[in-house]
UniProtKB/Swiss-Prot annotation:
EC class (word): transferase
Signal peptide (residue range): none
Recorded GO MF terms: S-adenosylmethionine:tRNA ribosyltransferase-isomerase activity
Origin organism lineage: Bacteria, Pseudomonadati, Pseudomonadota, Gammaproteobacteria, Oceanospirillales
Family: Belongs to the QueA family.
Origin species: Hahella chejuensis (strain KCTC 2396)
GO CC terms in record: cytoplasm
Record-linked Pfam families: Queuosine_synth
Protein name: S-adenosylmethionine:tRNA ribosyltransferase-isomerase
EC number(s) recorded for this UniProt protein: 2.4.99.17
Length: 351
């Protein structure tokens, strides 16, 4: 299976660079993965597509203001993108500079903070806050929201609210679980009043989610690693919903990856740790029955995941329809609602 099989042409003006004024006013493309039938709805119409007894599973990670700008003592400019906070004073980060910093090099962040390079760990750098306080304090005071590169603008204060789900509560992500951005408090309340259940997993989305696939053959791709937690309570609720004939509806590809990682044994079990699960066509889903998701980049691992879920041909046809109907794409864009395609329809693959 080739990466080029997941390519499509997107007019640049369809990339959403800012969110709509109202979260739930986005459009919703509904795809029947069995027939390929497409319906165009508003996101609020999702309320009529889920049933009492279904379980919506959200990723409650919270985006941290992970982008820092500073300079070396020699004057050279440095950009730091935090990948993971490892302690109160240390972080793993991507560093952009004219020369990669060596151990002991100091990076000045505004007037009050100094980062010291401790060591290199693969593509990442371990940095210590050696002056000014804790990592969380540094990020809160000096950090910028890590908007995806395709948004192509500087972040502003509104992004601190809008590039964040209303239910986020576990800080640690450097990218938002964007399918959840469409849910507002009113829609969540309406879901609850209808008898739709909700559960929360945590997967801290890493900067690797923005990295392009650099191989030609899908199976050769090495997936980045991200930390996740699926609790025993969530597992029990999943089992109960399925036993009663309800559906597990994942809100976003990160919720899919969390649930399916916890289901690698063939049934869902509590899980806490890193995952590098790579889902592409041929993967047999264990837990997830339906999926709310945004539109994804060409040739991306997320496009491969939704293709595994609903069939590549149906997905690409739906994307073409969305382009013709002028849907808004990517993080601040519109959404899709997919039903899982039956397994065995495409060549196998999952790592």
């Amino acid at each position: 299976m080739r990466v080029d099989d997941f390519d499509f042409e997107l007019p640049p003006e369809l990339i959403a660079r800012r969110p709509l004024a109202e979260r739930s006013s986005s459009r919703l493309l509904c795809l029947d993965a069995e027939t390929g039938e497409i319906n165009h709805r508003g996101f609020k119409d999702l309320l009529g597509m889920v049933n009492p007894g279904d379980l919506l599973v959200f990723n409650d990670t919270r985006v941290i203001p992970a982008r820092l700008f500073g300079q070396k003592r020699s004057g050279g400019k440095v950009e730091v993108m935090v990948e993971r906070v490892v302690s109160m004073t240390e972080m793993l980060a991507h560093v952009r500079a004219s020369k990669a910093p060596k151990p002991g090099v100091e990076i000045l962040i505004e007037e009050n903070y100094v980062l010291t390079m401790v060591e290199r760990e693969g593509d990442l750098f371990r940095l210590r806050v050696s002056q000014g306080g804790s990592v969380s304090e540094l990020l809160e005071r000096c950090g910028h929201m890590p908007l995806p590169p395709y948004i192509d603008r500087e972040d502003d204060l509104s992004d601190r609210e809008r590039y964040q789900t209303v239910y986020s509560r576990q800080p640690g992500a450097v990218a938002a679980p964007t399918a959840g951005l469409h849910f507002d408090e009113a829609l969540l309340l309406a879901m609850s009043q209808k008898g739709v259940e909700t559960a929360f997993v945590t997967l801290h989305v890493g900067a690797g989610t923005f990295q392009p696939v650099r191989v030609d053959v899908v199976q050769d791709h090495q997936m980045h690693s991200e930390y996740l937690e699926v609790s025993a309570d969530v597992c029990e609720r999943v089992r109960q919903v399925k036993a009663a004939g309800g559906r597990v509806v994942a809100v976003g590809t990160t919720a899919v990856r969390a649930l399916e990682t916890a289901s690698r044994s063939g049934s869902i079990e509590p899980y806490a740790g890193d995952t590098s699960i790579f889902i592409y066509p041929g993967y047999e889903f264990v837990t997830v029955d339906a999926l709310v998701t945004n539109f994804h980049l060409p040739k991306s691992t997320l496009l491969m995941l939704v293709s595994a879920f609903a069939g590549r041909e149906h997905i690409l046809a739906a994307y073409q329809e969305a382009i013709e109907q002028r849907y808004r794409f990517f993080s601040y864009g519109d959404a899709m609602f997919l039903h899982r395609r039956q397994s065995g329809l495409e060549d196998a693959g999952a790592n």
